[in-house]
Each structure stands twice: as C-alpha cells, then as structure tokens.
Amino acid sequence: MAAQRLAALHAAAPSAFSSTSSASHGRPAARSSTTALLPVALPRASATLRAAPSRLLPQEAKAAGSGRSVMCMASASASAASAAVASGAAELKAAREDIRELLKTTHCHPILVRLGWHDSGTYDKNIKEWPQRGGANGSLRFDVELKHGANAGLVNALKLVQPIKDKYPNISYADLFQLASATAIEEAGGPKIPMTYGRIDVTGPEQCPPEGKLPDAGPSAPADHLRKVFYRMGLDDKEIVVLSGAHTLGRSRPERSGWGKPETKYTKNGPGAPGGQSWTAEWLKFDNSYFKEIKEKRDQDLLVLPTDAALFEDPTFKVYAEKYAEDQEAFFKDYAGAHAKLSNLGAKFNPPEGFTLDG
C-alpha cells in the first residue's frame, strides 16, 4: 500500500514542472501548469531574498553601516544649517522692524545709508584674501577706522544701531550695517534693495583697512578720482553715477567734511539735528531730485560738490545723469541693483551663498 502511494506521488511530480520542460523545447505551456508553478516558485525566491544579507562579508557589512552613518550625519548637518539660516533670517527681520522704528523717531536715514556704504566701500578687487581685501565685514565698528577722516560723524550711527546689535547678538555687524542702510533707503521712499545676508565679521581692529580708500569730495580732477576709487571696487561708470544719486538724502556738515554751509533754509529747522547744507530741498526723501538740482543749478542753498558737478561735466557720466534726471523709474531700478552689489563687496558669507529674507 505504501509502495502504491509512493508510486502515485512519483507519477504526479513531473506534471508540476511539465510547463518548464515544454517551454524549453518551444512548446506553449498549459495554463493549468503555469498556475501550479506559482505556489512553488515564489516562496523559494522570497527565501533567497531574506537570506541575502546574511551572505555579506564582514567588510561589506561594515562599509554598508558606515555609508548609512555618513548619510545620517550629512542629513543632520543639512538640517542644522537650514535651521541656523531660518533663525538668522528671523532675527534680521525682527531687527529690520526695530530699524524702521528708529527711523521714525530719529530721522537718521542719511547717516545709516552712509554707515553701510563706508563699511563696504573699502573693498579692493585686486586683493583676493579676506579680510585684507576690505569691504562689508563690520570693521567700521572699531575706533581706528571710525577715526578715518572720511568717517567723521559715523560714531553717531554706530551708537544708534548698537542697541539693536545688543538685542540680537547673533547678527553680525556687517549684516546689521547693510540692513540698516538698505532699510533707510526703502523707508525714505526709495526702491526695495535685493539684499543677501550671512556676512561674517572681522574680529579685531588690526583687520581694519588703511585710511584713504573712500572718495574725497573735492579732488583736483573729480571724474578721474571717482573712477580711480570706484574702479578699484569693481564698479563701472553707470554705477558711479547711479550710486551718487543717494546724495538725494542727507546734508554735508562743514565741521565734518569741510564742505557745505553751517545751515540753510532747508536745514535750519526740521527733523533731526539742525545744520549743514543739503543736496536737495527734501533731504529725507529718496527720489531723483539730486540729478535735477545739479543739472539746473538754480538754488544757491543747495550743495553741489566738485564730484557732483562732474556727473554732468564728464561726457560718459553725463549720459547716465541726464537719464536719471528725466526718468526716476530708471534711476530706482538701476540704483537697487548697484546698492545690492555695493553691499556685497568683499563680504564673506556663511553659508557661502548667503541667504535672503524673502520680504
């Protein structure tokens, strides 16, 4: 009886594999035979897959584990960097609101614009090393640089923004100076500046640039002087003219620069400390009136420096100056790009590409 059952099983076994045998000879397999294969083939394949990891050599297993660790570390590092940028952007946005409030109460737009400009305007494109190349690196906070002749009065700007720096200690001075400058332009009615942040500060006064890097108001050859200074920074004739348009804000004080009247009908009274001579009648409003006033030269109470007059005397400069006197929209557009470029000169960023505030 047992022999009969064994014979029956032996006879049935070939039918389970008959489809494979037939296919190997070019004959189509019966549908019922294909179905019969599935319960046999799939469990075997699954068992093979489950057993595969156990066949890794020790070195391979170690390498696989190391690779996963590196990936996890990279992911954690990227997450930390992203969180740091988000935190930095949040602090800068909060600081920007404080700057806006400061501007409302002190009307210090001109001196904050100057603060950002003079920190970045020391850049030398011919020097590659940071911070020797100068530029927007926060060095203007040190006394040795504040005492440069071109920076007369900027200690007052530092005093204005220092409480904001104390409130947000993670913001670099370099970022704070440029944030204050761009915000002052915007709050005075000027264009929105497409700013980048993440600038790194220098750490000591020994890293300050030498004196003499900034423009002089009354050189013997004004156009040549402007080109020498701005070309060193990597800026061109168009950018020289459009950036000069920021003189639509502010006044020149003779006790600081040696230029201008002690006071005029436009500066005797009004917001802020009285005195000085302004380039425009509404010297807290950012517009293209600077170019109009220089071109017309009709108001003796308004200031025109030799470097201002050069914009309409030099034939190349004049093309741009005439354009901006007629077209404020063009002035705003070109100014926004030039100001953003100036604010980045010489800067070293963390992260290297910097980051924006997105509104």
Swiss-Prot record:
Biased composition (Basic and acidic residues): 252-266
GO molecular function: heme binding; L-ascorbate peroxidase activity; metal ion binding; peroxidase activity
Domain of life according to the entry: Eukaryota
Active-site residues, as the UniProt record annotates them: H118
UniProt: K(+) binding residues: T248, T280, D287
Segments of this protein annotated with the region Disordered: 251-277
Stimuli inducing this protein: Induced by salt stress. Down-regulated by hydrogen peroxide in leaves.
Record-listed heme b binding positions: H247
Required cofactor(s): heme b
Keywords: Calcium, Chloroplast, Heme, Hydrogen peroxide, Iron, Metal-binding, Oxidoreductase, Peroxidase, Plastid, Potassium, Transit peptide
Enzyme class per UniProt: oxidoreductase
Positions of disulphide bridges: none
CDD domains, per database record: ascorbate_peroxidase
A Pfam family assignment: peroxidase
Cofactor note (record): Binds 1 heme b (iron(II)-protoporphyrin IX) group.
Single GO cellular component term: chloroplast stroma
Gene3D superfamilies: 1.10.520.10, Peroxidase, domain 2 (1.10.420.10)
Presence of keyword Plastid: yes
Site (Transition state stabilizer): R114
Family from the record: Belongs to the peroxidase family. Ascorbate peroxidase subfamily.
Protein task: Plays a key role in hydrogen peroxide removal.
Additional remark text: Binds one cation per subunit; probably K(+), but might also be Ca(2+).
UniProt protein name: Probable L-ascorbate peroxidase 7, chloroplastic
Gene this protein is translated from: APX7
